[in-house]
Amino acid sequence: MKKIILAISFLFVFMVCAFAQASDFQRAVGHFKGHAATATATRTTHKAALAKDATAQGTLTMSQPAQVEIAIDGGKDALLMEGSTFTMTVKGKKHVTTSQQNPQFATFQKVFEAILAGGTQDIAALKEVSVKKDGKQLVLTITPEAADKKQQRRMMFSSFVLTIDAATSQLRSLRMNEKAGNYTDYTFTNFQFK
């Protein structure tokens, strides 16, 4: 009997925590519903083997239903998510994949679709996502899980960290962590809803 009561108590606490996280997320991204957004983007590329980080300027454009573009140096370098299609442009050369071909982007896609929908899509059920409230900011960490060792070796990123201003719904940063301590960090300023 004690085990049953303990199990029910644990389940209740888990449900309350999941509901609280979903509620925090919905409040934090509520301004996106029905709006597009733009911002100035600053990219910082950190390579553990190099002494100095490289920085560059660009723009962030987000529009519904599922388009997110970060263009750096006039589009010479860019990240574009259009639904399930992901395009990375590096020095003018395009690399295209989809969330079906490259599963590490599937949860990333679902999270951004939920953000652009103003929080109406539930992310609480996504096991690869953790949501943490840090003062006035909401921090979403997406840690893709590989199905096997081969897929894990092919993964470009070990995690994605999104920081959202909980009061204004403004996306503050996106950090894409790579292997061996390398990362690319995008910080966003002059955020505007349209």
Feature locations, PLM:
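Gly/Pro-enriched, hydrophobic low-complexity segments
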Residues: 124-127, 131-194
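N-terminal leader/targeting segments and the immediate start of mature chains
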Residues: 16-56, 63, 67
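An acidic-aromatic
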Residues: 59-110, 184
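Positively charged n-region of N-terminal signal peptides that target proteins for export
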Residues: 1-4
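Bacterial N-terminal signal peptides
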Residues: 7-17
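Flexible, surface-exposed loop/linker segments and immediately adjacent secondary-structure boundaries
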Residues: 94-137
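A generic structural motif
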Residues: 42-48, 71-73, 89-91, 176-179
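Short, surface-exposed coil-to-beta transition loops
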Residues: 54-57, 75, 82-83, 155-160, ...
